[in-house]
From Swiss-Prot:
Keyword Nucleotidyltransferase: no
InterPro entries per the UniProt record, alphabetical: C-type_lectin-like, C-type_lectin-like/link_sf, CTDL_fold
UniProt keyword terms in alphabetical order: Disulfide bond, Glycoprotein, Host Golgi apparatus, Membrane, Signal-anchor, Transmembrane, Transmembrane helix, Virion
Residues modified by glycosylation: 133
Domain of life: Viruses
Keyword Transcription annotated: no
Occurrences of domain C-type lectin (ranges): 54-163
Subunit composition and interactions: Interacts with protein OPG161. Interacts with protein OPG164. Interacts with protein OPG190.
Family per record: Belongs to the orthopoxvirus OPG162 protein family.
Protein name stated in the entry: Protein OPG162
GO cellular component assignments: host cell Golgi apparatus; membrane; virion membrane
Organism: Variola virus (isolate Human/India/Ind3/1967) (VARV)
Residue ranges, Virion surface side: 38-168
Name of the encoding gene: OPG162
Subcellular location: Virion membrane; Host Golgi apparatus
């Protein structure tokens, strides 16, 4: 095998530095492109597309208006539920979506229920207990409107917001 003279070796050295730089840049750009292409698989979001993430919960404005029965069904289809009346997130949700929306509080036969699961609710633990306790109707459903729970007819149509915890 022939040995290379000094000039040839010098030329190889001069050419190898730019080639090495190009290879490094190419590798970095390729890595960035791969990351961007597979970012959903590499770094999954806690909430699906369209859902808004806030304090370990995901919220979805369905942009539809329904009665309470249909609302519960719609949220269940999405593996979610209606916002509870005792959550501290109600004001934040109102400021984000700026809509009146159903909450999971219903009065039926003078019993207070969570319509997500039909379990009894102790309304004395709710912040607006006095306002709710003054309700004389045998049946009423509630929406969150401008900072407070407001009684409405259960068959009326109101905006639907669904909520679920991360990764469910």
């Amino acid at each position: 095998m022939k040995s290379l003279n000094r000039q040839t070796v010098s030329r190889f050295k001069k050419l190898s530095v730019p080639a090495a730089i190009m290879m490094i840049l190419s590798t970095i750009i390729s890595g960035i492109g791969t990351f961007l292409h597979y970012k959903e698989e590499l770094m999954p979001s806690a909430c699906a597309n369209g859902w808004i993430q806030y304090d370990k919960h995901c919220y979805l404005d369905t942009n539809i208006k329904m009665s309470t029965d249909n609302t519960v069904y719609q949220c269940r289809k999405l593996r979610a539920r209606l916002p509870r009346p005792d959550t501290r997130h109600l004001r934040v949700l109102f400021s984000i979506f700026y809509k009146d929306y159903w909450v999971s509080l219903k009065k039926t036969n003078n019993k207070w229920l969570d319509i997500n699961n039909d379990k009894d609710i102790d309304i004395s633990k709710l912040t607006n207990f006095k306002q709710l306790n003054s309700t004389t109707d045998a049946e009423a459903c509630y929406i969150y409107k401008s900072g407070k729970l407001v009684k409405t007819v259960c068959k009326s149509t109101q905006s639907v917001l669904c909520v679920k915890r991360f990764y469910k």
